C-alpha cells in the first residue's frame, strides 16, 4: 500500500511539519535582532537633566575660582615674605654694626669732655689735648665711613623730639620758646636711625 493512501502516514507527516513550523516561530521570537536584546538596557539608563548639568558646571566653576583665589593669596604671601627677607637683609647690612657703634659712643663722649676742660699752657697738657682731638677726629671719621652722623644742634635751633632729648625747660627772655639753649651731650644716628638723641636744654 502506498503512503498516499495511508491515513496514518499522512497524520505523522502533518505532525512533523507542524513541529518544524513551531520551532522556527520560537526561534524567531527568541532570537530577533540585536536591537531588541539591547532595549531593556537602554530603558534602564538615566541621563541627567540640563538643570543638573548646569548646576554641576556652576559648582566646578566655583571650585576653580576658589583654587585660583588660594593660589593668588599664596603667591602674595610669598611675595611679602620675599620682600620682608630682603628688608631684613638690608637692615642687617645697614644696622649690623649698631651694637658696636653704641659701645663706642662713651669713648667719644669721654674725649669730648676732656677737650671741654679749660685750656692750659702746660706743654704736656697741651700735647695731651692735641692727641685727644686727633683721636676724636679719627673716631668720628671712622664712624662716618660706617654711616654714623653726629647730631650736634646749635643754640637757637628748633627743638626736634625725633633728634633731641629735652633734659630741662628754662625760661630765657631772649630765646624763642621750643628752641635749644644749650647742648649737654651730642647725639648720633646710624644711616638715618637715631642711636642716641642729643641731650639739650630747651627754652620755655
From Swiss-Prot:
Keywords: Chaperone, Cytoplasm, Stress response
Keyword Chaperone among UniProt keywords: yes
Keyword Nucleus: no
Any Pfam family matching the protein: GrpE
InterPro entries: GrpE, GrpE_coiled_coil, GrpE_head
Main location: cytoplasm
Gene Ontology biological process: protein folding
Transmembrane segments: none
Location(s), subcellular: Cytoplasm
Molecular function as annotated in GO: adenyl-nucleotide exchange factor activity; protein homodimerization activity; protein-folding chaperone binding; unfolded protein binding
Residue span of region Disordered: 1-52
CDD domains: GrpE
Stored Gene3D superfamilies: 3.90.20.20, Head domain of nucleotide exchange factor GrpE
Biased composition (Basic and acidic residues): 7-22, 38-52
GO cellular component, one term: cytosol
Family: Belongs to the GrpE family.
Protein task: Participates actively in the response to hyperosmotic and heat shock by preventing the aggregation of stress-denatured proteins, in association with DnaK and GrpE. It is the nucleotide exchange factor for DnaK and may function as a thermosensor. Unfolded proteins bind initially to DnaJ; upon interaction with the DnaJ-bound protein, DnaK hydrolyzes its bound ATP, resulting in the formation of a stable complex. GrpE releases ADP from DnaK; ATP binding to DnaK triggers the release of the substrate protein, thus completing the reaction cycle.
NCBIfam families: PRK14154.1
Assembly mode: Homodimer.
Official protein name in the record: Protein GrpE
Gene field: grpE
